[in-house]
């Protein structure tokens, strides 16, 4: 058994998450974690809501509520959505916990002591009309690197590069469209140049990374500059330095603190299970690999910023230094970044109404239909497009007509003819029977190898190819025509049931909800595919502060079945089956497109009205 760390990108708590988000960080990470657990490995899968920084302030200002109120609301919304999607976190928490603040400040202080954090000045944007500092994400303009419009003051989504507001061309305020002025202010900086040699050397040892990820990551080191890790903002983690700790308008930069969340969540998980040092097996043991799942817009922070923070904390940059009490921290084994998903040919945008939220699609369609579509058509290594027509087609042709129908046919034939799993009669067995069982057993290595190499689309395609071959076997053997030969009929149906069971194991990481139903359709009892749960907890360091976490019980041999062919048992009662998957009516496509157009129009009108009101206020 090996320890496997699965770190999942932290969604901003500034609104509900949409399908484009979970296609990048959510479902792929869960498929991988579920597979590794079935392999017998000890997986720790962590994440949480990212609740500091300007995205929260921007939305809170729009709604006229405090940043904490907004974070509290969307922490609950997001946690429920991700739990409903079946994402099997060991701990999904948040960045406003006392535990997270302590861990972040510990890393800052050690990096400062080691000489990798220093004080300097930086230009900040000021609103001419109010005199207020405008945080990074309140500023938009043209990217100086790729020329894309709509780049933010902290990052360009088009090219993925990190930016400072004063680097933007033609910068304007998102609040009211005015042009900001820039003034020098004091900040702390992370000395990335002093860490670049060690960071790049580590990157060049990486094997098996997606080509786009490793090439982009290495390209970040063509020109490395120090980055400010504090901001003129009143919402965030206090800077743990005398003269700064009590300053209400100086906080740590959200991206310095957010990536530390993987470590702080692991520590919180260990504290909550009553073994405060248990996290070290995943972070201090150099043989333990850590896999980071995200969208491609977060590559910079996981292949440069977070590794640099760890190198600085470990004292492994050009200035040397001591390892902090939490270290030495393991560098990432792999950064698994997906490309972007669009919707009906348009870029996802909540503000513009180009969106389908997780909670909405799960309210109208089965969860595994959603997971299946994300897995089969998601942006694994190239951009992909969510279309309602393809969503319905994949569900109807592949889940309902192929896989679901196969399960029902086999279970129904067994129930009607035997009422239980029939025996496999060697005397009546044929090469055709043995070939099918050999194929399904061999598929574990093939499908598993593809998942391990983060080629989940191919893995799912291979599993569904096996499903197709089982269907062909049923058609070729025609069990409904051999009822007068009980021994042969029993052997065919035993073979089919074993093959279906094997296919269910192969599909379980992708389709955990229906995998449980298939298990029960073949007479299985107990938990086959464990699902996560929400728990309301109290903060470990801030009495009275409560919030929901996602957690679960995922134990091999108890709630997790192995990544292997488990022999079915003759004599197991098989009940009358019920449909596993239902077809979605074809007219749903037009209904969804009409809903999409109506919501798009309404959101555009609302945003235009808001901007007009802001402009009128400014001019008045």
Curated annotation (Swiss-Prot):
It is found in: Cytoplasm. InterPro entries: Anticodon_Met, M/V/L/I-tRNA-synth_anticd-bd, Met-tRNA_ligase_1, Met-tRNA_synth, Methionyl/Leucyl_tRNA_Synth, MetRS_core, MetRS_Zn, Rossmann-like_a/b/a_fold. Zn(2+) binds at residues 143, 146, 156, 159. Monomer. Is required not only for elongation of protein synthesis but also for the initiation of all mRNA translation through initiator tRNA(fMet) aminoacylation. Its cofactor is Zn(2+). Belongs to the class-I aminoacyl-tRNA synthetase family. MetG type 1 subfamily. GO terms for cellular component: cytosol. It catalyses: tRNA(Met) + L-methionine + ATP = L-methionyl-tRNA(Met) + AMP + diphosphate. Binds 1 zinc ion per subunit. A motif ('HIGH' region) lies at residues 11-21. ATP binds at residue 350. It comes from Bifidobacterium adolescentis (strain ATCC 15703 / DSM 20083 / NCTC 11814 / E194a). A motif ('KMSKS' region) lies at residues 347-351. Its EC number is 6.1.1.10. NCBIfam families: metG (TIGR00398). Keywords: Aminoacyl-tRNA synthetase, ATP-binding, Cytoplasm, Ligase, Metal-binding, Nucleotide-binding, Protein biosynthesis, Zinc. Gene3D superfamilies: HUPs, Isoleucyl-tRNA Synthetase, Domain 1, Methionyl-tRNA synthetase, Zn-domain. This is Methionine--tRNA ligase. It is an enzyme of class 6 (ligase). CDD domains: Anticodon_Ia_Met, MetRS_core. GO terms for biological process: methionyl-tRNA aminoacylation. One of its GO terms (molecular function) is metal ion binding.
